[in-house]
Amino acid sequence: MQTEHVILLNAQGVPTGTLEKYAAHTADTLLHLAFSSWLFNAKGQLLVTRRALSKKAWPGVCTNSVCGHPQLGESNEDAVIRRCRYELGVEITPPESIYPDFRYRATDPSGIVENEVCPVFAARTTSALQINDDEVMDYQWCDLADVLHGIDATPWAFSPWMVMQAANSEARKLLSAFAQHN
């Protein structure tokens, strides 16, 4: 895969430039554009993934299906599709917006900061998974209600962005409706 960049943003969310992805994620990470996606199968089960131990930030942590960064000139929806193919080897339905104005800042135990405007999407898988071990070390198809209960009971076991997304009542409602609509 070619070198990825992040799109840097000012405080109003306006693009100001780009920076190589790994150089961008430090203890002083600048605000940048990302996306987060929750994938469901035909049974309405959520794909929960565990980040590979080789990941720079939050290695080994359980999280929602796929996250990443759109590239310059690429729509968020196209970026979701690209990363689903790269990380999971899977085809998906067109991503649907769930939480378009999600923004967060979090610091992982090693000091790496995520500082992102991160629209959240949901989609359905339409093919079998072919996991990229460089990205995902494990995965499980789960009932969304069970995952949400797990997040509420043990938020420390999940990525901070997944916990924050699940804490938004409107996003939670839309994800639940998406999961039930087979």
From Swiss-Prot:
Its cofactor is Mg(2+); Mn(2+). One of its GO terms (cellular component) is cytoplasm. Residues 30-164 form the Nudix hydrolase domain. One of its GO terms (molecular function) is isopentenyl-diphosphate delta-isomerase activity. It catalyses: isopentenyl diphosphate = dimethylallyl diphosphate. One of its GO terms (biological process) is isoprenoid biosynthetic process. Mn(2+) binds at H25, H32, H69, E114, E116. It is an enzyme of class 5 (isomerase). PANTHER family: ISOPENTENYL-DIPHOSPHATE DELTA-ISOMERASE. Homodimer. Catalyzes the 1,3-allylic rearrangement of the homoallylic substrate isopentenyl (IPP) to its highly electrophilic allylic isomer, dimethylallyl diphosphate (DMAPP). This is Isopentenyl-diphosphate Delta-isomerase. It comes from Escherichia coli O9:H4 (strain HS). The gene is idi.
